[in-house]
Amino acid sequence: MNWMSVVQQLSTSLPLRKIYTLANRVPILGSALRNFSRAAIPSDALVWKSIRSGPGKGLWIHLNPRYEMKYLEGDYEASVERILLSNLRPGTVFYDVGAHIGVFSLIAARNLGVQGSVFAFEPDPSNVRRIKEHASRNQLDAIRIIPKAVSCTDGRLRFQRASFQSSMNRGVLVEETLALQESAIEVDSITLDAVAREHAWPTLIKIDVEGSEAAVLQGSEEIFRFAKPLLVCEIHHEQASSDVTRWLLERGYKFQWLESSTEFPRHLLATYLG
């Protein structure tokens, strides 16, 4: 059986998908399954698949079958999807910061149509390429793709690109002294304030930047002072939690955690008290 047959079986058979998901949660079985997938499926393989359920049902995505099959079930970061859907209305301007391969941007763009705006921010060139493919395949070309890192300053930053198996292929911004690996590249950076002044003020922001959340917010002072958007933010460690929550409280926001677990990463929902 070749790797395409393996992918086809796992992606089309609901019983097989459920067995595969459950088995992955058992240490010994999960390890065996991962070893099998590594042997059967090339690490850089990409196949077109349609999301089967949830808010993204029917959307086509170009995914890596070894590491990204969870997107197909339609419940990846379900709490974020619920917040997104309940706050998409005519006139919404959505900033997807750390868009990865653009799934949330696609969901937002399809729901808003011409009645809103979607901006996808992503510094990794390979992910940017996939966002463009997804927008084209799903006829959602109105998504504005900003191929830059979002930070507290406009300029250039070092970005550590991730492999597929590393945190769902999400890279991180790194200090210059740490950016010595071959996979580290230099990328343009921009503040959200700069984008808002040039284009449109956001009403809804999603942030997932692997630990650089505070820097994103520091470059968004004008937005949170004047536009006061709803914020959904993935927090990756205790220090980021402290920095982000303090920053929000000082600007008149209240927040709640979307998951009951206290383990990181976890998602924060913040709304303006006024």
Task: Describe the predicted segments one by one.
Residues A99-I101, P125, C152, V209-G211, ...:
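Short, glycine/acidic-enriched loop or turn micro-motifs at the edges of active sites
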Residues G56-R82, D141, I146-A196:
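Glycine-rich adenosyl-binding loop in Rossmann-like folds that engage adenosine-containing cofactors
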Residues A108, I131, F159, V216-S220, ...:
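Hydrophobic packing residues within well-ordered alpha-helices of enzyme cores
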Residues G116, I143-R144, T203:
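Short, conserved active-site loop motifs that form the nucleotide-linked donor/cofactor pocket
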Residues G113-V114, S136-D141, F224-A227, Y253:
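Short helix-capping segments at alpha-helix termini
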Residues P125, E182-V187, V232-Q239:
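Acceptor-substrate binding/catalytic loop of class I
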Residues M1-H134, N138, R266-G274:
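S-adenosyl-L-methionine
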